[in-house]
């Protein structure tokens, strides 16, 4: 609980992992937390051990972000009810490199999974980042959440400290 600040670490074991050849970032709109959890299960079934992140961002997050982050570019045309930021890793060079048709297999697979999710009405909109700059832009919005909330609270006369980072236990 004290993260090593009150004791001496005498031994440690490290498990090293191969760096991914590619990380695909996508942003989707789910209508509810329930649909977002179903979405996570669909992605886990197609990409076991490859989901690097799955971040839920409700509509209030986007409203606060729009009010407090300069030059914010929303990932979708309208403010999502429940935004989900997903990173999927690819460890295979074949998955991350264009094939004969010029398609990147991991991206094609993500598109197919998204199509299934649309058909199941789990999502209402989605976008896949085309480059690292788009991915960094989305992540910078997510990472600015605490500062955005602080600015919003300073504008109001509400309590002066409000932070949240919600984790949902994932059942195996």
Feature-to-residue mapping (PLM):
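Noncatalytic alpha-helical scaffold of FAD-dependent oxidoreductases
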Residues: 1-172
């Amino acid at each position: 609980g004290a993260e090593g600040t009150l004791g001496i670490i005498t031994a440690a074991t490290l498990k090293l992992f191969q760096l991914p050849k590619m990380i695909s970032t996508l942003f989707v709109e789910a209508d509810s937390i329930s649909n977002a959890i179903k979405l996570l299960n669909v992605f886990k079934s197609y990409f076991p051990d490859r989901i690097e992140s799955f971040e839920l961002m409700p509509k209030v997050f986007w409203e606060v972000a729009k009010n407090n982050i300069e030059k914010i570019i929303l990932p979708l045309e309208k403010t999502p009810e429940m935004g989900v930021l997903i990173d999927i890793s690819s460890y295979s060079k074949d998955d991350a490199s264009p094939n004969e048709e010029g398609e990147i297999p991991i991206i094609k697979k993500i598109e197919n999974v998204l199509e299934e999710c649309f058909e199941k009405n789990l999502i209402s909109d989605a976008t896949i980042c085309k480059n690292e700059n788009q991915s960094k832009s989305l992540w910078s919005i997510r990472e600015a959440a605490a500062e955005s909330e602080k600015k919003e609270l300073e504008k109001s006369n509400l309590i002066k400290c409000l932070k949240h980072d919600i984790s949902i236990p994932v059942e195996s």
